[in-house]
Amino acid sequence: MNILTMEPITSDALVFFGATGDLAYKKIFPSLQAMVKRGNLNVPVIGVANADWNNEQLVARARESIETHGGGVDPDAFPRLSELLRYVAGDYKDPATFQALRETLGNAQRPAHYLAIPPFLFSTVVEQLAKSDCTRGARVIVEKPFGHDLASARELNSILHSVLNEQAIFRIDHYLGKRQVNNMLFFRFVNSLLEPFWNRNAIESFQITMAEDFGIKGRGAFYDATGTIRDVVQNHLFQVISNFAMEPPARRDSESIRDEKVKVLKAIPPLEPANVAVSYTHLPSPRDERRYLVCRLLLEKWGGGGGGGGGGGGGGGGGG
């Protein structure tokens, strides 16, 4: 897919795991209504979770979500979304759950499976999808964080590749869907007046602040296992840093853009303890507390020249 044009990929069903979770409540349901409103969604939308719900309860959850986080229920789009919604209840480790999903998919040949679930469940769900014949012709969208560490990320990658080809795997960061983040590439590379000055000779440092006005209510278990760095820094904020500092890609395809982002990340030396401050690290179970992190990064060889750190970046994340 061309990231700069955001060309859509056609699927004939959308399955999202974690239908009763926080990401679905805050992001997915409002996005689904927006897609219906724009005419971009007219296929079955199947929510999967372990809560003992039915279709009507899923629709009610979608309504509450959109009223709270989506700017209100659209009188035309929401009824159409309601007709598309289906619900499959069951344990992700139970093959019967995925057999029920296979039956609910019906004649769908190109389903898209969106894993809006905790990372430790990714492998289980992918393997169960394969065993139930739900991966044939399918695409799998994996949310961040991708693994808990390097070893688990490699293991997850291996499992995905054992049942899907690379073109069918989408490792996504929903933060990149924010208009300001996505438009940064246009802002930089289309602006012929600005880009010549976007280098270490004109920019001494830049600061990125991610300030959130909500805590971790309802997500204590996830946050205790994940933490600020895995939740928002090594994905959300590093993507923003990459967009800010990457060189113009040779082509506007996803691989060329990815390659330039990788160059930025490789140019950042390992963090030194003196450049990192984390709050609440000594509390045994700060479930009701905000997490906070600030760090100073050095970006070596920015702008194509030699020499040392040309820029610095800081990121703070709270609540997640």
Predicted segments, located by residue:
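Conserved small/polar residues in nucleotide/adenosyl-binding loops
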Residues: T281-E289, L293, G305-G320
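Secretory/organelle targeting and membrane-embedding segments
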Residues: M1-I141, F146-L283, R287, R296
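Short amphipathic alpha-helical "recognition" segments used for binding
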Residues: G147, G304-G305
